[in-house]
């Protein structure tokens, strides 16, 4: 809608890209509704009022305005490292527009502004658990919401592994270095590259 004032009643004529079924003006403020417009920037719309004596007003130039009915598109860029021991993990997603971020599910963050680019946010402190319900949505400056982005499931685990059994046992005798295998059992699955050993006589 658009409001303008006229000092006489008359017939409204529209110019440029805008039109309306509201074609009668009163002496005073008039609020009209433009016919449907496509998403775009409009700077050429004009309004003229012609009175009963066929005298035309000046052509009123409507201030430039933007019609935007399309929400941003958001997508995951870098998932949360899983499993991980960071209770405030970072997450990167992309947005096609600037806007305000809202969070859903178990996750939240103090990062609430999105750029039209990649965005890295830090989730607020999370407990040890697996999270598969976290969502992110970006709403642009026109109030259009993005698609709902489901964050890939991740696990936070802060308890270090323990050794549950060792062969040979401590101080065990009659062990052959050449034929006996040394085995260690841990309380959980291990990253082999992170396991180190020390040997001493």
Question: Can you describe what each PLM-predicted range is?
Answer:
Residues 2-3, 9-22, 90-92, 98-111, ...:
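Short, surface-exposed alpha-helix to beta-strand junction/turn motifs within ectodomains of secreted
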Residues 24-33, 113-122:
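Aromatic sugar-binding surface patches on proteins
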Residues 33-43, 122-132:
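Surface-exposed, short loops/turns at beta-strand junctions within beta-sandwich domains
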Residues 43-46, 90, 132-135:
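Short, conserved beta-strand segments of beta-strand-rich sandwich/propeller modules, principally
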Residues 49-51, 138-140:
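Conserved structural position at the C-terminal beta-strand
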Residues 53-59, 142-148:
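Short, exposed coil/turn segments at beta-strand boundaries within extracellular/luminal domains
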Residues 61-72, 150-164:
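Flexible, low-complexity linkers/stalks enriched in Thr/Pro that connect modular domains
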Residues 81-87, 172-178:
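Short, solvent-exposed loop/linker segments at the N-terminal edge
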């Amino acid at each position: 809608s658009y409001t303008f004032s006229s000092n006489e009643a008359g017939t409204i004529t529209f110019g440029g890209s805008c039109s309306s079924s509201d074609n009668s003006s009163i002496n005073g403020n008039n609020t009209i509704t433009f016919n449907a417009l496509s998403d775009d920037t409009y700077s050429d719309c004009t309004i003229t009022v012609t009175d009963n004596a066929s005298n035309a007003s000046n052509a009123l130039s409507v201030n430039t305005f933007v019609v935007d009915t399309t929400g941003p598109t958001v997508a995951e860029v870098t998932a949360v490292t899983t499993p991980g021991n960071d209770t405030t993990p970072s997450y990167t997603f992309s947005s096609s527009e600037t806007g305000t971020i809202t969070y859903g599910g178990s996750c939240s963050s103090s990062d609430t502004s999105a750029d039209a680019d990649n965005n890295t946010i830090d989730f607020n402190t999370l407990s040890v658990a697996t999270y598969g319900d976290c969502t992110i949505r970006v709403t642009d400056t026109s109030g259009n919401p993005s698609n709902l982005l489901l964050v890939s499931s991740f696990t936070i685990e802060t308890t270090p592994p323990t050794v549950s059994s060792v062969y040979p046992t401590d101080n065990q005798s009659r062990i052959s270095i050449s034929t006996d295998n040394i085995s260690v059992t841990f309380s959980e699955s291990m990253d082999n590259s992170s396991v180190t050993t020390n040997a001493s006589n």
